[in-house]
Amino acid sequence: MQQDKVNLLGLNQKAIEDFFISIGEKKFHARQVFKWIHKKGVIDFDAMTDLGKNLRHKLKEKAQITIPKVVFSKASKDGTHKWLIDVGGSAVETVFIPEEGRGTLCVSSQVGCTLNCSFCSTGKQGFNRNLSAAEVIAQLWIAARTLSKTDGEHDFTVTNIVMMGMGEPLMNFENVVPAMDIMMDDLAYGLSRRKVTLSTSGVVPRIYDLLEQSGVSLAVSLHAPNDMLRNEIVPINKKYNIDELLEACKLYAQNGPHKHITFEYTLMEEVNDNLSDAEELVALLKSREVPAKINLIPFNPYPGTPYKKPSNNRIHRFKEFLQHNGFVTTVRKTRGDDIDAACGQLAGDVMDKTNRKQRYLKKLGDTNAN
């Protein structure tokens, strides 16, 4: 029986070195190939000109570099770019957001999501599977290779990564961490820990593991100032409550790259956007002594949701109260809404688990017909 070829795309530097040793080759050859793949974007062994002919032949027998197919891509009028990527018959989305002086890539970690937060469109798809490390890093590989550096108006260089796409990254820890290792490797994309941010809904044990094994920047999807409300809208809170979550956050802030935690708070009208909610949030964070920045996210409605986006006045009032009480507070701009790329819309054309494959196949058929 022929052994399956190893996909080198998802191997971090140590793993690819171990693979080369296992086939009787030297570590420095592994580093050469690693650099070819990620720094230069080359996936054809024959094009790796500093490798000997015998080594290239051996690699073709024992390894492969497989990039997922891009089903389609869309560019927004504001410069935002979205890709729908085929991951073995299912699809995930990746979004690039250009801003002045930076370009942020929002990366998915799962097909669907297990956590079923009540306001999240991705959660309504149900959960299919975790992405492999290769499928995670492929999103950056594709973006880095297909974006032009500039169109005269927008800068299209990826400078920051946010693990905030489809899925809960800490529920796919074993694949997400090696992929982030590649993102931060100087032989690959060379991003610093400050430039790679993982967002979690609060898988508390894995927050401690993340600090020990990776130490990237941490963002926490809080969305509520008390357990009663958070139990309702972020169900994982029933397993790991706010006290446990903030205890982990405090330790992470003390040892992480930013010395603070970014708390994401999706504002939903008359659900969690009242002044009393802001007061409770301030009291909560001050009492737990967690160094915090707060990122307010106006809710983006999607078909079938009972929630509404607050008025600008309510958003401004909430922000002003937090700032007045000493918290650095930002309001996330709505970006890419004309291509369904804004936060909360990452389900896009693959809205629910039942119809995901049919929708994907239809999109693939439409693409091939053009």
From Swiss-Prot:
Keywords tagged on the record: 4Fe-4S, Cytoplasm, Disulfide bond, Iron, Iron-sulfur, Metal-binding, Methyltransferase, rRNA processing, S-adenosyl-L-methionine, Transferase, tRNA processing
A Pfam entry, by short name: Radical_SAM
Keyword Iron-sulfur tagged: yes
EC number: 2.1.1.192
Limits of the Radical SAM core domain: 99-337
Obligatory cofactor(s): [4Fe-4S] cluster
Residues that hold [4Fe-4S] cluster according to the record: 113, 117, 120
PROSITE patterns listed in its UniProt record: RADICAL_SAM
UniProt name for this protein: Dual-specificity RNA methyltransferase RlmN
Species of provenance: Francisella tularensis subsp. mediasiatica (strain FSC147)
